[in-house]
């Protein structure tokens, strides 16, 4: 089946938004759920039938779209890992498999940068409480990870997310005036305009720090604009660690033999920016 005849989107070709009403109509009318249907991931088409793509992890998202529209019993996505791990084995030698995750926890992990499941894949499944199974195509008999309504994590372990090659930017007021809501709004507008993704925020009365990802090399241009209004300090090639469900031992593991530039703690999440 040509997926472009089923998934209809807007014309934002590289990260298209789904027209859910039309997509639901196409799938409900033309898919026979009791036979094997094979189609493609990642693609859709706009109102003029031009091909569009669904953005990062678009193939997994395609499965979620079909599952939502067909009221599927479950969705299984196949990866080159045993399932969802509590840490990247490349950076943490004792990484463990998570047997079960709630939708909420999976979305939190994905928001902070966990790469196995994208938030947009989870959202339609959560709406209809359709379970998602993440399994290994290398070892297909392994149980993998289930994502569903219920317990946040099983086993309940600290979860580590690593983002390398980050940029830590600190803005401070030139005249010691407060950094107010209108300043912050302007700053975020500039980051958005320069396609710079903000991964951490910390602010005080006269300073504002962010850890960002300059994927498109726009920082020099942005820095020139910001420097007209703020004193700008920055540190390149830093690493951002996020720990969900942190404890003292988890923090020690991250901080060992590193220079900590910034640390931020909320109820369930600790974020640490380091220079190694």
Residue ranges of model-derived segments:
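Flexible loop/turn segments at secondary-structure boundaries
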Residues: 7, 45-47, 84-85, 140-143, ...
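Nucleotide/pyrophosphate-binding catalytic subdomain
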Residues: 1-117, 122, 275
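Short coil/turn connectors at secondary-structure junctions
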Residues: 1-3, 32-35, 47-49, 70-74, ...
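Electropositive, surface-exposed helix/loop patches at the edges of structured domains
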Residues: 30-46, 109-133, 170-184, 235-254
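A conserved active-site cap/scaffold subdomain adjacent to cofactor or substrate pockets
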Residues: 100-148, 153-156, 164-166
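A conserved regulatory-domain signal marking ACT and ACT-like small-molecule sensing domains
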Residues: 143-276
């Amino acid at each position: 089946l040509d997926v472009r005849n089923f998934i209809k989107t807007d014309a934002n070709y590289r990260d298209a938004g789904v027209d859910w009403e039309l997509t639901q109509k196409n799938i409900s009318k033309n898919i026979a759920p009791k036979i094997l249907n094979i189609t493609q991931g990642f693609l859709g088409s706009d109102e003029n039938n031009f091909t569009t793509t669904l953005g990062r992890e678009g193939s997994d998202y395609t499965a979620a779209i079909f599952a939502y529209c067909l009221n599927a019993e479950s969705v299984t996505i196949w990866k080159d890992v045993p399932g969802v791990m509590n840490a990247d084995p490349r950076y943490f030698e004792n990484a463990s498999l998570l047997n079960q995750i709630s939708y909420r926890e999976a979305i939190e992990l994905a928001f902070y940068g966990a790469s196995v499941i994208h938030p947009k894949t989870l959202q339609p499944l959560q709406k209809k409480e359709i379970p998602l199974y993440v399994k290994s195509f290398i070892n297909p008999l392994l149980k993998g990870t289930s994502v569903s309504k219920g317990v946040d994590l099983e086993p309940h372990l600290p979860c580590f997310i690593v983002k390398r090659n980050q940029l830590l930017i600190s803005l401070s007021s030139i005249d010691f005036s407060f950094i107010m809501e209108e300043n912050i709004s302007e700053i975020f507008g500039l980051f958005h305009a320069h396609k710079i993704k903000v991964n951490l925020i910390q602010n005080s009365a006269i300073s504002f720090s962010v850890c960002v990802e300059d994927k498109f090399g726009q920082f020099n241009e942005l820095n020139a604009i910001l420097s007209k209004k703020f004193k700008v300090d920055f540190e390149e090639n830093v690493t951002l660690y996020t720990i969900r469900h942190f404890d003292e031992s988890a923090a020690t593991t991250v901080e060992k033999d590193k220079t900590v530039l910034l640390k931020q703690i909320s109820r369930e999440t600790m974020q640490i920016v380091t220079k190694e």
